[in-house]
Amino acid sequence: MRKAKPKKRVILPDPVFNDQKVSKFVNHLMYDGKKNASYEIFYAALETVKAKLPNEEKSALEIWKKALDNVTPQVEVKSRRVGGATFQVPTEIRPDRKESVSMKNLILFARKRGGKSMADKLAAEIMDAFNEQGGAYKRKEDMHRMAEANRAFAHFRF
């Protein structure tokens, strides 16, 4: 066991929207310390989203936040050994982990899309998530389905 819980680092808000969530997302998107490239990709993706959904009364940032909410899981399954058998125990997810998992899934499935630039792939995944479709949304649904199927083992909580 560790002595003390590590302090949470303060993440500075992004320069355009002044939002910490955007900064966190860009940090997940970043490769090799290239944060400016990540910001460019993210902002280009939001521009594309706004261009593709012109009749939507929400701003591109609000669409992105709604898409994130749509792919945020509420429960997950964790493996737990009990008497030689391994059970998939459904557990609720901490709020900070919910946010992190949803961002990582959105980025992962955007990267898996074929062809085009990363900005286009991210924009497509954001629009799919906004419309409750796409890989990231499917991953959330699968997590919930697994938790529901293993509900009988919920009394093995950690």
Curated annotation (Swiss-Prot):
Swiss-Prot/TrEMBL GO biological process terms: ribosomal small subunit assembly; translation
Query: Which Pfam families did the record assign?
Result: Ribosomal_S7
One Gene Ontology CC term in the entry: cytosolic small ribosomal subunit
What does the record give as the function of this protein? One of the primary rRNA binding proteins, it binds directly to 16S rRNA where it nucleates assembly of the head domain of the 30S subunit. Is located at the subunit interface close to the decoding center, probably blocks exit of the E-site tRNA.
Keyword terms, alphabetized: Ribonucleoprotein, Ribosomal protein, RNA-binding, rRNA-binding, tRNA-binding
Record-stated family? Belongs to the universal ribosomal protein uS7 family.
Output this protein's name: Small ribosomal subunit protein uS7
In terms of InterPro entries, this protein maps to: Ribosomal_uS7, Ribosomal_uS7_bac/org-type, Ribosomal_uS7_dom, Ribosomal_uS7_dom_sf
Q: Which NCBIfam families match?
A: rpsG_bact
| Complex formation | Part of the 30S ribosomal subunit. Contacts proteins S9 and S11.
- GO molecular function of the protein, one example? tRNA binding
Bridged cysteine pairs (disulfide): none
